[in-house]
């Protein structure tokens, strides 16, 4: 019997373990951290052996194949040992893809992928299609393949997941944009990160579709290198060469495969970045044959994504917006661009090799004050202090950051949490960071 070892027992790993067990493999799960009770219960209910708090190498190095959590770097010592002895190391998505014939709509990009994924899922669900949501959001793809049957899966993919995918094929691949992110995981080499993102197109055939932002200079440059077989569906803000989806005369237009249009003001999501998300989602739904009426309705009644430009409250004339999901500089750029009032920006956290010059002009134009929130704020001081804005340095946590921002903000201004950084210095996750922000805003 083939032995499969799963490293990491979160949503992805626990789901992969269940699928491996259901398919008759000898299955073992190992996690360096504590495993959440709900995942222990899931593993126990399927009689899957597991360990937590350490990796027992002799129980791992004898695997025929290893499924790795996306959070474990490819250069982790244990992964290097496995690769050195020739043991295949794959992702949960790669493993799950072997056991389903469902259509795969896969979304990646440095920014916008969660909103776009959620919006595509909303359109498909609203059209009464049998659809699952998986990848970075929703339920583990492997668990759904093991326990449910869907005709379509809408899958958000990070570069870390794509790194360990080899034979998986996306029927529709969506690439929103490529800007510097996670460079700490890619030896601070931008090309390594770009190559990871473009893995979403590998194995695509002439029957498949590749949807991408036509104005992204990196994507345009890379297209020529990759010799893609898939049919190309570029989108842009305005009508231009090659774009099959754009806005013209305040109207959203998609010209292929079926002509579609709707008034831009009817879109539920506002702001330039959300226009791109809506265009990519509209093309995906159009390709799946969803009716124009269903696409229009779903694009106009979508409720948005938590922690992404989420309006929290207005306190004594000051608006508070939670954009905790902005874990890179480009995400913050989009958030600042959408601000219509003077803004107190809360930023900081675990820096991933950030270049803050991208937001320099917007910070100078839009911000009235800055709150640095993190254990190590030296880089923020070095870059932003010269702007001459009032600054608060907070190293203790979200409560103090919210109170500092509230004191700095004037009536009619906005406090924006858009950190540019990962959350792991002071918080468990970007969700934890956003939840704490909302909690302390509501306590003001």
Indicate residue ranges for each PLM-predicted region.
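N-terminal leader/targeting and accessory segments in enzymes
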Residues: 1-91, 95
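Nucleotide phosphate-binding/pyrophosphate-handling subdomain across enzymes
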Residues: 3, 15-23, 262-367
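Residues in the short beta-alpha loop(s) of Rossmann-like NAD(P)-binding domains
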Residues: 10, 33-35, 137, 215-216, ...
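Residue-level signal for inorganic ion chemistry
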Residues: 20, 66, 107, 136, ...
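Phosphate-binding loop of NTP-binding sites
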Residues: 21, 58-61, 70-214, 218-229, ...
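Short internal beta-strands
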Residues: 26-32, 210-214, 346-347, 366-375
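C-terminal helical cap/extension that packs against the catalytic core
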Residues: 39-40, 357-413
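Beta-strand->loop->alpha-helix junctions that form or flank phosphate-binding loops
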Residues: 51-54, 90-94, 227-247, 298-300, ...
